[in-house]
From Swiss-Prot:
Keyword field contains Transferase: no
This protein's UniProt keywords: Cell membrane, Membrane, Transmembrane, Transmembrane helix
Record-given protein name: UPF0182 protein BAD_0641
Bias type Basic and acidic residues, positions: 991-1013, 1050-1060
Region (Disordered): 1-72, 976-1061
Family listed: Belongs to the UPF0182 family.
Amino acid sequence: MSFFDMFGPMFDPEGGSNRAGRQNPRKPSNDDPIILNVETDGGDGPQPSSNVPPKRPSGPRITSKPNRPRKPSNGSKIFIGVVLALAIVIGLFFALAQFVTDVMWYSQLGFQSVIWTQLGTRVGLWLAYAVLIAAVGFISATLAIWARPDAADGSTIRVNGDTIEIGKSVSSKSARRIAVVISLIVGLVFGSQFNANWSEILLMFNSQSFGTKDPQFGIDNGFYVFVLPGLKLIMSAVSLLLLAGIIFSIVTHVLMGGIRITMPVNGHGLFRITKRARRQIGIWLMLNMFAWAANQVLGVFSHLTEEGSRITGATYTTVNATIPVTFIMAAITAILGVILGLWIMKSHTLEGSAPIAARASEALKAWKVPTVAIASAIVVSLVLTVAWPVLLQRFRVNPNAQEMESTYIQRNIDATRAAYGLDKVKAEQYKATTEGEEGALADSAESTAQIRLLDPQIISPTFKQLQQSKQYYTFADTVAVDKYDVDGVSQDTVIAARELDLDGLDNRNWVNDHTVYTHGYGVVAAYGNKVTADGQPKFFEAGIPTQGKLTDSEKYEPRIYFSPNATEYSIVGAPEGTKSWEFDYPTGSEGATNTFKGDGGPKIGNIFSRLLYAIRFGSDQILFSNRVNSNSQILYDRSPKERVAKVAPYLTLDGRVYPAVVDGRVKWIVDGYTTSDAYPYSQMTDLGEATKDSTTESSDTVSSLNSKNANYIRNSVKATVDAYDGSVDLYVWDQSDPVVKAWEKIFPGQYHQLSEISGDLMSHMRYPESLFKVQRELLAKYHVSSANQFFSGEDFWQTPVDPTESQQAQQRDILQPPYYLTLQTGGSSEPVFSLTSSYIPAGSSTREILTGFLSVDSDAGHEKGKIGSSYGTIRLQELPKDSNVPGPGQAQNNFNASADVSKELNLLESGSTNVQRGNLLTLPLGGGLVYVQPVYVKSSGSTSFPLLKKVLVAFGDQVGFADTLDEALDQVFGGDSGASAGDAENVGDTTDDKQDAKNDDSADGKTNTDGKQDTPSNTDGKTGGNNGDSSGTMSADLKKALDDAAQAMKDSDAAMKKGDWSAYGDAQKQLQEALNKAIELEQ
């Protein structure tokens, strides 16, 4: 059976085979079917056609008649059809449910333009390209059908000795129908690939000027970032259209007889192209070659972002060989297209039948023009694109590389600094001393008083044990560092939100998971530089209900419905007058309840909405539960980062989301970046690799950026997500960024302007960590401003590995993270909240000395709508090349090598306790660099938590180790540092250390499957965790244990000063016993 025997009935109601049997001998016309030959080995080859068509065989001539399979019955056909129809309907309904609920979600947030713009663009591109490719295919096929010869035989192939026809007669009308169907199928398939690049098209039509031009062609950088990617996409689409056109043309001509190919039989074969077919194919070929040439021209501009062995961008060989050759090859490609196209259109040697040997001989003569043209183009291409650049690089550039590449290296330096925001770095020489003198910190008293001792990663378990209250709450495994005004003084603060953790529930069911336990409660904040006498964080905001310095406002809303840990959907809202069933917070009885009053999610009061969400989440409870009522809302996609990613999918989001109390509400702050990989000459960087460090490797809360190459980045957007109602606000932060300006045009009304940021919110806008990590990665090389010095690479630096990590992690080059600290650096008149890091020499040298200290001012100020003047100022303090200031790794080694430190740490680690070393901070103080590292002690019990017990300090090669930072600083600065670190009060009687916030007593508050609260087993009003209050409510046993611990600490200090290590060991043992007793009583 031939191809058209099978598919002919789809286009001819009477069937192709019946029509063939009715055919009468007459002069063929344009609508006559084409006769395709069926030959055997015994024939003499194809015979010339005559006016009377030969009788057509019903199929290929074969020796045995195959058994035909039984046709399915009508009942089976109907059943299969019904099943397929149901599957399609169900699939469409599920897709509809997903789409409609997405529209409801975006509409509720006020970002419906995002989904409609995306959908409209993607569907529009898909349909436009599908129509174009279908139109091209249809036109190409129609032209080929129109050009069919008046009389023609078909083409044949030979299979296993039999000559088989590859087509059967078909009318022009049927052929057009086939062309329409195939064209549409091809168009829809390739159109779906084209719509994925919707953002490039939108940016091209909303392009902005950068105001700077590339140094090679003098074109505005906006052309490369916005226009060029779109042009490349369009040219790729055009190339595919033209390729489809020529393929449709050739295939249709073969089927219509315009091209006839018969396999050789007894040495005879046939290859023939009609004149009209030659013209069409020649034109299509020229168009394809022109498109190829245009793509080559566009490729020239890509050389400016091409990654080389040393830099990104066009180097000497590229500029002087590759780029000119590309223009030459584009011209050659276009000329070759003309030559080949004209030859095909005018050649008369492609007709007639002849033996294969004769045909080969004729072909060599007849095809001389295209053969010579193609061969010449290949030779020229090899010489120009391969040999010439290699020879130029080998014999001219390499021997004089520094001189010949300096211009292009300088271009790379300048462009990289501009693209990464490094062009305004304030660098200064810092001649650091390593000799600590008495009173050296007198001029740095304010910075010294703000040195943060609490490690945000180590103290997370402490937060959980002291403030979690119940097992269904949790805190981030790395708490955030921010600053707050407490009693009129700016304080470095560690802060975390008490998030809901459904995994902690004992009684998991649909009612509890989705209607009862719906939210977390409040934030917990502690001083960054203060602890209690027993080493616990000193909270100034804590407890349930929350009390403290941050939430004394009556309008404070503590409930946390939206948070990184809220992964399940919740259904909230109840009719007026109905008793609340949402669990609010634990109390001494059944627990307080609450009903959500905000506008946080799509309303699902009607049956249609409930049905849609039941399908989306695969839960019939949404349809049938009484908890779903006319006032119900469904909250989902509750992670702040996820919400911002959905409303601004074109942004790259920072790896850390942090909470802040702003104007009486808890807000999650998310930093958004605009990026590009098309900034001319700027160095390409893998953002994922550049933002990895020890924190991202060990934390579930903090992550690196997604791995992708970029050579331009700006922190253009600050986003906030309200923890209560999930509302998202996007603020244009960098108003000079052309990329965010383009997105503002694409999504008008989506952004708030800088002037709309309140003063309270402004005070919590920090310089983002991921951007700083990318910048420090680049600045390790690009602090070098001279092309010649850059070429030598002798002054390149690197970020040190984290010396507090395990040996295995250090071998994997896990980098030290940057740290937020309040300090005073060169050029600043007073201490500034800053993000800091340090540098050591690049390479594998074992001598790890400090080469530079990097900081960026992270305080955005507190004025409404105005960013602080120093915010974002990057300061680099470069140490002299002959400096011997230890780097972080060497400082850690000095700590480890100290006999006194090792002895005390061994004593602390004896028994059932473990020592944990906190973050190693580097601070420019006292004319040099001070290293500060808190030391925590943690017992081995499952409910234990780290307590700050000691502080390590290093200055030069001098090491201090004491109970407080004050004492440790005094040890390395001649007995008196001249400044107070503010933590001397941390050592003393625990009865004098009162927390600033209390935890209300709470019960389990579990809920049964029917939604009613279980009667709590703990009804004595006491919580299972520390309430942060060491006042009169403390039990007598607990007070005695803490008093014993305080006395043991005093005995330890006295023994250490006398050098009586035996007494010191006894005191430490007593201290551990007292702490274990206190912890046991606390639990």
